[in-house]
Amino acid sequence: MAKLHDYYRDTVVNELKAKFNYSSVMQVPRIEKITLNMGVGEALTDKKLLDNAVADLTAISGQKPLITKARKSVAGFKIRQGYPIGCKVTLRGERMWEFFERLITIAVPRIRDFRGLNAKSFDGRGNYSMGVREQIIFPEIDYDKVDRVRGLDITITTTAKTDEEGQALLAAFNFPFRK
């Protein structure tokens, strides 16, 4: 069992229940899933780039990614419908908690020139999205074996109804928001 999950159950639930005056523990927001997405537009010309991106995402998440395909053709980007253009992973349960712990304690502090995460990146319904410019902040990625520095999108989906509740949930885990 991940330490953060135990911490959530034992401490965070009680804090948030008191702060927002919930009548039931089931009303307290929780993290539902974490989605990692890596767009690889250059995969149109070199298929090996997509394979390397899949390998990176597998190492980061511990789960095999789904290859995403273009929904429609766009002549300006020279893509046709059905072309593979990226990969994504949805983490839930145990793997989600382990990834969240690694993200907060190891990966985010390794971001170059890090001054905190933007607290305005909530979507209006308590979900938080952030972008990472380099996949090498994760300790699972070996810097010497990286063919190209790629970024990825990380979306933390919560059951919170408002941004304030979502921010309080993530702040309870010492999520490094910018002051």
Swiss-Prot record:
PROSITE patterns xrefs: RIBOSOMAL_L5
Keyword GTP-binding attributed: no
Record carries keyword RNA-binding: yes
Record keywords: Ribonucleoprotein, Ribosomal protein, RNA-binding, rRNA-binding, tRNA-binding
MF terms in GO: rRNA binding; structural constituent of ribosome; tRNA binding
Pfam families found in the cross-reference section: Ribosomal_L5, Ribosomal_L5_C
Gene Ontology BP annotations: translation
Database matches in InterPro entries: Ribosomal_uL5, Ribosomal_uL5_bac-type, Ribosomal_uL5_C, Ribosomal_uL5_CS, Ribosomal_uL5_dom_sf, Ribosomal_uL5_N
Any one cellular-component term (Gene Ontology): ribonucleoprotein complex
Function statement: This is one of the proteins that bind and probably mediate the attachment of the 5S RNA into the large ribosomal subunit, where it forms part of the central protuberance. In the 70S ribosome it contacts protein S13 of the 30S subunit (bridge B1b), connecting the 2 subunits; this bridge is implicated in subunit movement. Contacts the P site tRNA; the 5S rRNA and some of its associated proteins might help stabilize positioning of ribosome-bound tRNAs.
Subunit structure: Part of the 50S ribosomal subunit; part of the 5S rRNA/L5/L18/L25 subcomplex. Contacts the 5S rRNA and the P site tRNA. Forms a bridge to the 30S subunit in the 70S ribosome.
Record family assignment: Belongs to the universal ribosomal protein uL5 family.
Record protein name field: Large ribosomal subunit protein uL5
Gene symbol of the encoding locus: rplE
